[in-house]
């Protein structure tokens, strides 16, 4: 189910966010947390994404597991600022292959010492365009209504 359809519902929406572990050794703690959260019957669960795609495979695996085992729709986060184009395409294709149709597209924090002028993606809007070209995704984004803090 697409998140936009859930949010359009007149009833209040309940969602939870989980963070993938940094290593596969900590998967059990995430699995146990997901079990407890899923029992609360949330409308959806979001799964965050490590900076630079460091836990991107974990994001896709956890999101797919939540949907497959618990029937809870998921929203996979993606960041782009320090991710090469090929990584973004691979992650997007993996999400699609695993049946994840909801993505929260974020620029992400600029890593210390990173030269933004060398980035394949400088803005989340560029990531959104890339995701749209790769499948029928429901894409959300974040914004700063008054201006991004970097420009204030």
Spell out what each predicted region is.
Residues 102-152:
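Conserved anion-binding
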Residues 53-77, 120-141:
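Alpha-helix-loop-beta-strand connector modules within alpha/beta enzyme cores
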Residues 80-94, 121-122:
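Glycine-rich anion/phosphate-binding loops
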Residues 13-29, 74-86, 138-152:
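Active-site mouth loops of central-metabolism enzymes
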Residues 1-47:
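Conserved N-terminal beta1-alpha1 strand-loop-helix module at the mouth
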Residues 26-34, 59-60, 91-92, 149-152:
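Distinct, well-ordered alpha-helical segments
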Residues 21-24, 42-62, 109-119:
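Glycine-rich, proline-tolerant flexible connector loops at the mouths of alpha/beta enzymes
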Residues 9-13, 41-44, 70-74, 99-101, ...:
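Short, well-ordered coil/turn segments that N-cap beta-strands
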